[in-house]
Regions:
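Extended alpha-helical targeting/anchoring segments
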Residues: 1-492
């Protein structure tokens, strides 16, 4: 972008992406992350494998963040210098909303769908600011309710073209009319620095991938205690308090590997529609989630309920037999229908009347290790509503709470031994143009202090088997626990 164009855009925009396209068909997203982000805090890598198989068009490398919005002692807290005009204390959700509104910038034609915004996670427990579910006083992990990076520099790999688009966002932090030429020069200098970093040779020798094994792990709330809780929930369901409740267990195992190595193994062994690596201040998040929470693009909102699971078959014939069995299971179908209704109700709160519809109902979607029943629900975002409103209306996912949501979450709060932290919240972005894309934070590891924390839940209904539900939690956590253990042994 030349200086004259930049000056014109600067008259009514606080964020302007300055870009440079390079041919980079010899690099991978992981190599780009190594070269550009160098595994620094405040960086990320976002990828996607459609249906767990073919790679999506774009991968996003977060190279640098201008500031980080987090929470401390229940109050919004910024690391770095926040933009002028946004809250620096108070409700962290309100601070997030205000930041997105203050930096709102129309999407620039010809650029990828994401060029900058607030990127990170909202933990499950931030729902306490949206619903009265209980105090959640037990909090052994003490993870911030949210951590969102104000992304200034990123690189977008276009797998179709074999190109990389470097983006340096010129952010008007002070909301002043002065300093326009200097801001352009600074953005160009950052592009130069990223281009130079791409020329660096980064040692990444092949590493022997050891056989996948389930490591030894500890359960915070498992076995007999969890099964007793399942029986308790079943009694509450029979009494009419809820239709379904989704309790969860947290597992932990040693992690000596880097967050990047855990991510490398997870993307190789369990590719999913949402794959992410975040390096935050003091902890890391690595995940491979199969399920969107909600996506907003060009004023259209979409949720993608997933419920009902079978393993993949060893042969095409066995695979189809398992799919037929899944679709014929009345319990799985009933649970899925309930979640579709939840999705319709959630979108109905923030979409135009009559616009919410189920566009794909109960199809089987296959991933690398499992298959699920999936549906797609869409709606047109109502006037005066934003992607932030849509996100909070759908938060948290019914698949991680139950139905009806408020009472199911109250029961979870009464029974689970500690706050959930990241698990059951969401990971993704709210961009400056008014769009968003978030995944449910499942199949995800929190890495901190040499330990990996992995959490998984099971949907309990009136006829659930406590032993089977306990095992389901362990089965769901297994892929991530295995990835951590494999990463610990890379090259051995």
């Amino acid at each position: 972008m030349d200086l004259e164009t930049f000056r014109k855009l600067a008259t009514d925009r606080r964020v302007i992406p300055v870009t440079r396209k390079l041919l980079a068909d010899g690099d991978t997203p992981v190599a780009l992350y190594r070269k550009l982000a160098a595994e620094r805090p405040g960086t990320f890598l976002l990828e996607s494998a459609e249906n767990g198989r073919s790679w999506s068009r774009y991968s996003f490398v977060g190279v640098r963040s201008a500031a980080t919005l987090t929470a401390r002692d229940g109050q919004a807290h910024w690391l770095g210098v926040p933009p002028v005009g946004v809250p620096t204390d108070g409700d962290p959700l309100a601070a997030l909303r205000a930041t997105i509104e203050a930096l709102h910038t129309p999407h620039q034609e010809g650029l990828p769908p994401f060029t900058g915004g607030m990127v990170g996670y909202l933990g499950y427990d931030i729902v306490r600011r949206l619903e009265k579910i209980g105090p959640g006083e037990r909090d052994d992990l003490r993870l911030p309710e949210l951590t969102m990076l104000l992304t200034s520099d990123l690189a977008v790999m276009d797998h179709w073209e074999g190109s990389v688009l470097l983006i340096a966002n010129a952010i008007n932090h002070n909301d002043l009319d002065t300093g326009v030429d200097e801001a352009h020069a600074d953005a160009v200098a950052r592009l130069d620095a990223m281009e130079e970093d791409l020329t660096r040779a980064v040692a990444q020798p092949p590493a022997v991938l050891p056989p996948s094994e389930l490591p030894e792990y500890a359960a915070l709330w498992g076995g007999p205690d969890f099964r007793v809780a399942v029986e308790d929930i079943k009694e509450r369901i029979r009494a009419g308090e809820a239709f379904q409740v989704v309790p969860s267990q947290r597992f932990e195992t040693p992690c000596t590997a880097s967050a990047l190595d855990v991510y490398r193994v997870l993307r190789a062994t369990n590719p999913s529609p949402y794959m992410y690596l975040f390096r935050f201040d003091g902890f890391d998040v690595v995940g491979s989630s199969p399920e969107a929470l909600v996506k907003v693009e060009d004023g259209q909102a979409m949720v993608h309920p997933i419920a009902g699971t079978r393993p993949r078959g060893a042969t095409p014939q066995e695979d189809q037999a398992l799919a037929d069995e899944l679709m014929a299971d009345p319990k799985e179908r009933a649970e899925h229908l309930m979640l579709v209704d939840l999705g319709r109700n959630d979108l109905g709160r923030v979409c135009e009347p009559g616009s919410v519809e189920v566009v794909d109902f109960m199809s089987v979607e296959r991933y690398s290790h499992v298959m699920h029943i999936v549906s797609t629900v869409t709606g047109k975002v109502a006037g005066g509503r934003t992607a932030f409103d849509v996100l909070t209306a759908c938060f948290p996912a019914g698949t991680l709470s139950g139905a009806p949501k408020p009472r199911a979450m109250q029961i979870i709060d009464e029974l689970e031994p500690s706050r959930r932290g990241l698990y059951g919240g969401c990971v993704g972005y709210l961009d400056f143009a008014g769009d968003s894309d978030t995944a449910i934070a499942i199949r995800t590891a929190l890495l901190r202090g040499g330990t990996a924390y992995v959490q998984a839940g099971a949907g309990i209904v009136a006829d659930s088997d406590p032993v089977a539900e306990d095992q389901e939690c362990r089965n769901k956590a297994a892929a991530v626990l295995r990835a951590v253990h494999t990463a610990n042994r890379l090259g051995m």
